[in-house]
């Protein structure tokens, strides 16, 4: 079994001659795996993969260990089942709930959606609850067979998913539609079904509510990730302590464009990623699905690494209701607002970890933007939709996203430690948001580069050093764009674009 180094501690391995702490993120040798995996006799683990740094926003919650198993009623496991093309890192993960959990999902809008994506959407249409999520790494099970029209019943990959779901449901003694399945890996490859089916009994028997169970599952879903991504928080909702936890994978093919089962398009943006979120809060099905919609829009749909929208993007969120909290039946209740904040925090923390771990990246880019009321009036007039999180916020996110996260030139400039703000101004101009050029402000960290549409003299050496320091420590570069002084604010996240990104992806399947 593989274990994650807990991300709420810092562990030193004596095997490292220089005694560096594994969680000193600036010391990573990116993509070389030279210090990220090492042998150990601790427990039954033969290797460790470190956990991503935690990027939780500030709020009335505390971080706790446990990931997807922190919430009451959930167990998890991860093991090697022979699905990976190379190595013996775990490649099968299972998250299960002791009771029927209220379920929600968000999925890629890519037309070539993977078989498990279609299966999960169908399952969520059939049932408001689910009790298990099975995830395999190695094969995406997307674009796996020809089929007439949109009939997935004739898709061999889809039939593989059904067979795996039925087998797992039998072992867990639940209905097949209560089993959800996610896949990640190489597109065009079907699941190694025989290997997966043979591994299910051991996977089920390994289920544990411990932190180790959650960590092993978080490791099992990784592919090109250098770190596992798992987090959990505890907070008070309506006078009762509830927990929200989650795990995610993603490093390349990151450009989410997901919609929920409500059929609402979530974003203006566009990972090959899989995510599972759990909570023990008690919440009505329709409210939970709307909450997940909002949280995904504020988190995973605001990140990008390479502008590539995957066939497999999936978020599954389960609520066991075992915390003893009062049932949340209204989206505008005080308790719902509290739970929404917790859900947002966990998803944002995981989303930022994905951007931080972008393939070949040396730093996280965090952008913020500001728009005014005049802009939103023009936006509405032109017929663009307003989202539940507030139209000013969405337009602000849209501006930031297109101005920074959709432009490889900006990513490359950050990697080159070049404070070339002209690329940012140029991209803002074609973001599709109408504004007066004399209202444009751009800053890099605390360094103001443009104000009122006019370039300002600034210390280029200091700006370059700011970027250099972030790259050397795998820190964060902050970029702010403003086209007004109104209340429309938003954030989004990306990473720099390095030579290593090209190398990693040029050699991905070879």
Swiss-Prot record:
Write one Gene Ontology MF term. Answer: L-glutamate N-acetyltransferase activity
Q: Where is this site: Cleavage?
A: 259-260
Q: In which pathway does it act?
A: Amino-acid biosynthesis; L-arginine biosynthesis; L-ornithine and N-acetyl-L-glutamate from L-glutamate and N(2)-acetyl-L-ornithine (cyclic): step 1/1; Amino-acid biosynthesis; L-arginine biosynthesis; N(2)-acetyl-L-ornithine from L-glutamate: step 1/4
Give the superkingdom in one word. Eukaryota
Q: Major location, coarse class?
A: plastid
Entry EC no(s): 2.3.1.35, 2.3.1.1
Keyword set for this entry? Answer: Acyltransferase, Amino-acid biosynthesis, Arginine biosynthesis, Autocatalytic cleavage, Chloroplast, Multifunctional enzyme, Plastid, Transferase
User: Which residues take part in binding substrate?
Assistant: 223, 249, 359, 505, 510
The further comment given in this record reads:
This protein may be expected to contain an N-terminal transit peptide but none has been predicted.
Question: What does the subunit comment say?
Answer: Heterodimer of an alpha and a beta chain.
Record-linked HAMAP family = ArgJ
Please state what the protein is called.
Answer: Arginine biosynthesis bifunctional protein ArgJ, chloroplastic
